[in-house]
Amino acid sequence: MDAGLKRELEQKVRDGERLTREDGIALYESDDLAWLGGLAHEVRTRKNGDVVHFNVNRHLNMTNVCTASCAYCSFQRKPGEKDAYTMRIEEAVRLAKAMEGESLTELHIVNGLHPTLPWRYYPRSLSALKEALPEVSLKAFTATEIHHFETISGLSASEILDELIEAGLESLTGGGAEIFDWEVRQHIVDHATHWEDWSRIHRLAHEKGLKTPATMLYGHIEEPRHRVDHVLRLRELQDETGGFQVFIPLRYQHDFVDMKDGKVRNKLQARTTMATGAEALKTFAVSRLLFDNVPHVKVFWVMHGVQTAQLALQHGADDMDGSVVEYKITHDADNYGTPNKLGREDLLDLIRDAGFRPVERNTRYEIIREYPGPDAERRESPQPMRV
């Protein structure tokens, strides 16, 4: 990138002028990560100061049985496979209540697209979880799952959302987005939910007063232009509804090759190289610069590792997600040493170590507690990372 274009982009960002598709592609083509990160950090600081948000949450994957065989997914199992499972509602409640003593504030629920599980299982699950943990927010189901519920129930998405909200739903999850462009999507997704239905369902959720996240799966067969177009579709929908709270870039993971049954389900692995730390940081920075109307950008440390997550906080991210606990979807495709859980104190240390002030939030980004920032004795930079 020549110096003149750099100055032009810097001026647009500092004037609060909206970046274009061409600007986004130019940013991805830049090899000056320090400059790009610094520019994104300006925007991040303007929006969120020196704060890094986190929450105390537990992920529940109540079934891994799925009709789809998406090319990136190691989580799904077919009916009858030996490690296929479906939890009883009582079991899901027991697992959730096990974290009650840790001041749990959110349950994050995502499942496979089970072919025979009745629709009523899902609102009943939410009702039981809400009854057992009335102070805990329920963030549940991707737009893909809602679309699946339409198929198995005969109800409309509007009717489904109404029933789920009555049962305690406070937010959808942001999954099922992957990459929206059909040029890529046709090769990685094996279900019927594409941009038209994904956006329809999130628009409906926003109309009903729900705030939702949005995601992007990157680092597989897509190109930077696909990432830019993905963000711009979401930005346009956000202009319309204002319902997205946070954008979450998710790094595609290669397969955990020693699966219990010896199978490698992650079909993209042979065709791809995992995104490097530098590519991850560039993706966070460009996302923060392009997605000017979303308040928050989250680094999901489970899919990036804690060191990359710390550095992402200097490249546009202002949220580190939470304690997580047993995120099966990624850990069925990850053998790279990322922990399965971080406690509150771990998160506080990581955030302070990166030079920021931790703020614990709930699902709605309401502040639960503000913590002191980094102390003078901390080292000057996060742990070194291989990029």
Task: Name the predicted role of every residue range.
Residues 35-79, 84-110, 172:
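N-terminal pre-triad scaffold of radical SAM enzymes
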Residues 16, 40, 70, 109, ...:
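Conserved, mostly hydrophobic/aromatic
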Residues 156-160, 221-235, 304-314:
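Catalytic cores of alpha/beta
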Residues 1-34, 94, 100, 238-387:
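Auxiliary Fe-S-binding modules of radical SAM enzymes
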Residues 96, 123-127, 161-162, 199-202, ...:
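Generic structural signal for well-ordered alpha-helices
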Residues 104-202, 206-214, 220-221, 296:
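Conserved SAM/AdoMet-binding glycine-rich loop
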Residues 57-59, 80, 110-120, 182, ...:
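Glycine-rich, proline-tolerant flexible connector loops at the mouths of alpha/beta enzymes
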